[in-house]
């Protein structure tokens, strides 16, 4: 049985979303201290000054759907959380990362962004004039 990624049903999409992206095998990647990610991030940062990490909350939890099912039948799985960033921070310049942290943000996600000084995002249309 194979699974794909997606998004939980919410106020923006009552059916949720099936993205059909493959899922990372975090337990296997942990065995070599996330070398795949370290290599991938460093190669990208060799080419660009900064890197935006989309769906940053996915490092903490992600929506898993059995291939062929609707997003309504998905379930939450735990990501590698702060352990991932603790490991890769030894070999990757986290100061060059930007987190797409829009939508629901977990308390532990915000703590990690603060710990490593990784900036999040603000969308002008979503800010009140008081924040400008």
Model-found features: residue ranges?
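Alpha-amylase-like alpha-glycosidases and glucanotransferases acting on alpha-linked glucans and related
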Residues: 1-130
């Amino acid at each position: 049985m194979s699974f794909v990624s997606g998004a939980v049903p919410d106020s923006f999409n009552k059916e949720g979303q099936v993205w059909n992206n493959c899922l990372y095998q975090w337990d296997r990647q942990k065995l070599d201290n996330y070398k795949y990610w370290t290599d991938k991030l460093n190669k990208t940062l060799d080419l660009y000054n900064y890197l935006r990490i989309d769906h940053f909350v996915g490092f903490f939890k992600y929506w898993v759907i059995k291939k062929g099912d609707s997003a309504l039948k998905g379930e939450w799985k735990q990501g590698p959380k702060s352990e991932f960033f603790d490991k890769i921070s030894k070999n990757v310049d986290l100061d060059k990362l930007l987190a797409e942290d829009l939508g629901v943000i977990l308390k532990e996600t915000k703590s990690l962004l603060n710990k490593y000084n990784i900036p999040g995002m603000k969308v002008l249309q979503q800010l009140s004039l008081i924040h400008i």
